Regions:
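Catalytic machinery of carbohydrate-active enzymes
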Residues: 1-323
């Protein structure tokens, strides 16, 4: 049993771990929250996906005990990918004898095979892959695959033709210090020769409306209007994807789509889009940008200095040139 992370990007970055486990003969069932479960259904090495009925926050012991009773006796090993206490509870309650995970949140007694959290910030793909117990791991590229029939059905439902559009994912759940300005996204939309789909959650609908209004006739706002499966399919068949450091950035990378990823407060050394067709724009490592961004990466939700130069100063022309 694999206990999945709760964010789309993190879920994508676990794929190389699951590939390693499957290659050595382990039959994989993934337990995931409903909003990330479709990501695991796009991984052929996953035999089964259990949708966990949990919500953000709280231990929700009653719900965890109920699931534990349902899966008791089915699994010999659990890989607990999140570092939270509550994530490690279910395998214990289900009586799974081998429970593998990183130390954290006072869960030393909940795990039987414990890894220490690295003091540096390794690439997240390598961080997850280390749970396999194998040494010398590198950050392998995550790969997602959807059955062609599912892609065709999703594109037909959205009225799309493969390669006939670009996708913008302008949101970033973490906070505004990871979001490239709406005006910059709109400028890119005006400069492209294909229509643009704006994808994201319902929380990002207003942001996408702002972009669409600034690029009249160029954008279709689908934020909050698609299933995650439809969003995955749309990204997989897009000509280009432009995004911040977000979950949908990792989805585009895993499908090998041509993409530009704009980084601000976070670091592409930690969560890069592992894709040969990706261009990363990050002013921190641009020697031509002056004065240097000594403040980056700050990993803050909002710019503590109030200027957000790391994002504001990446103009639309650089993105268009990269596409």
């Amino acid at each position: 049993l694999v206990i999945a992370p709760q964010w789309i990007g993190d879920a994508v970055m676990t794929e190389p771990l699951l590939r390693r486990l499957a290659a050595r003969g382990e039959r994989l069932t993934v337990g995931a929250l409903p909003w990330v479960a479709p990501v695991y259904r796009a991984m052929p090495q996953v035999a089964d996906v259990i949708d966990f009925p949990f919500q953000h926050g709280g231990l929700q012991l009653k719900a965890r005990r109920a699931i534990a009773r349902q899966i008791e006796g089915r699994f010999s090993t659990a890989y607990v990918l999140p570092n939270s206490l509550k994530s490690a509870l279910l395998p214990l309650l289900a009586g799974i004898p081998k429970r593998v995970g990183y130390l954290g949140e006072a869960r030393v007694g909940l795990l039987t095979h414990r890894l220490k959290n690295p003091k540096n910030k390794p690439p997240m793909v390598a961080f997850y892959s280390a749970l396999s117990g194998e040494s010398g791991l590198e950050a392998d590229r995550p790969v997602l695959k959807l059955p062609p029939a599912e892609v065709d059905a999703a594109l037909n439902a959205l009225g799309l033709q493969p390669g006939g559009y670009a996708v913008f994912a302008p949101g970033a759940e973490f906070g505004p210090a990871k979001r490239w300005p709406a005006a910059h996204f709109a400028a890119v939309a005006r400069g492209l020769d294909v229509p643009v789909l704006l994808l994201g959650s319902g929380k990002e609908a207003a942001l996408c409306d702002e972009i669409a209004a600034a690029a009249p006739g160029r954008c279709t706002n689908l934020a909050g209007k698609t299933t995650l499966l439809q969003a995955l399919a749309a990204i997989s068949a897009a000509r280009h994807v432009v995004s911040n450091d977000s979950g949908l950035m990792h989805v585009a990378a895993a499908f090998g789509v041509r993409q530009v990823a704009v980084f601000g407060s976070s670091s592409p050394l930690h969560t890069p889009p592992l894709n040969d067709r990706a261009t990363v724009l990050w002013l921190k490592n641009d020697p031509a940008y002056q004065p240097p961004l000594d403040c980056a990466p700050c990993f803050e939700r909002e710019c503590p200095l109030g200027h957000t130069r790391c994002l504001n100063d990446i103009d639309a022309g650089r993105v268009l040139a990269s596409l």
